């Protein structure tokens, strides 16, 4: 019983010190049809303009953008859709 109590106290101290990380990679987005008949591009998909990217449901705290990123082959940067947090400037990739 004493061991269980020590583990519980240790876990509480670790959470208090480190905090709980927020997962910014799972921002909900609105998957809609574009005027040209195609559907919007999900985050991490290659894009040409921001209008092609799916917009987040929460447009007050988040925004969608099309920006440069290194692809897996790392030969040259390409444009990919992102959903970013307004306050923390963290974007999904």
UniProtKB/Swiss-Prot annotation:
Expressed by the venom gland. Belongs to the neurotoxin 27 (Jztx-72) family. ICK-72 subfamily. GO terms for cellular component: extracellular region. Its main location: secreted. It comes from the Eukaryota. This is U36-theraphotoxin-Cg1a. The keyword Secreted applies. GO terms for molecular function: ion channel regulator activity; toxin activity. The presence of a 'disulfide through disulfide knot' structurally defines this protein as a knottin. It comes from Chilobrachys guangxiensis. Keywords: Disulfide bond, Ion channel impairing toxin, Knottin, Neurotoxin, Secreted, Signal, Toxin. Pfam families: Cys_Knot_tox. Disulfide bonds join 40-54, 40-81, 53-66, 84-91. Probable neurotoxin with ion channel impairing activity. Residues 1-16 form the signal peptide. The keyword Repeat does not apply. It is found in: Secreted.
